[in-house]
Amino acid sequence: MSLESSYTLLAPMYDFVIERPFRKIRADSLSRLPAEPSTVLVNGIGTGLDLPHLPTRHRYIGLDLTAAMLKRARPRTRGIAMNLVQGTSLALPFADDAFDHAVLHLILAIVPDPAGCLREAARVVKPKGSVLIVDKFLRKGQWAPLRRALNPLVSRLVTRVDVVFEQVLAKQPNLRLVDDRPVLFNGWIRSIRLIKNA
């Protein structure tokens, strides 16, 4: 089953499963957006669960792979300068350095090529811009035999559970890590802030 098909089927129940455990985590991550008005890419906007936590001083583009997710996000855009775009995170339909910042909440461990997704985010963010990430990651060298064993099945349906963030970041020399916090499930879910080199 393709990623687009999986998330089209999941759209009606996505909020029920994901909203509550990630509410404060999303808000805390988005509070790290700067005070000055900026242009921000919300990559993998899904049903729009980030929208209630977005500071209204910025202008946003929300991108998602599926029309079903964007349809659910649209009503949440009221009161926010937000345009919704259907597209893939692996080939963003935006020019280089188009955004001041990017938000990647629960997207890097979903796409089939996490390094490609982060590379695209780095491409469209201006130098000195930030990339805010919340997702499930293994730590480098972490054994996690059950997660690794389940990954072939789970990744075909909804998400990868074997992504090692340090390996993904190592492929992006133009991004530097400035903050990495364990936020849920004994550190499996992490909140990360990167800055693009000048």
Please state what every model-predicted region is:
Residues S191-A198:
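C-terminal lobe and adjacent flexible extensions of AdoMet/dcAdoMet transferase-like proteins
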Residues A115-P127:
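A short glycine-rich, Lys/Arg-flanked "PGG" loop and its adjoining helix->strand segment in the class I
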Residues T39, K128-S130:
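Short glycine-centered segments of the SAM/dcSAM-binding site in methyltransferase folds
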Residues T39-A91:
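Class I SAM-dependent methyltransferase SAM/SAH-binding core
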Residues H101-D113:
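A short SAM/SAH-binding and catalytic strip from SAM-dependent methyltransferases
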Residues L90-A102:
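A short acidic, Gly/Pro-enriched loop at the edge of an enzyme's catalytic core
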Residues M1-P37, L49-D50, R72, R76, ...:
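Conserved class I S-adenosyl-L-methionine
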Residues E19, L132-R190:
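C-terminal alpha-helical "lid/dimerization" subdomain adjacent to the S-adenosyl-L-methionine
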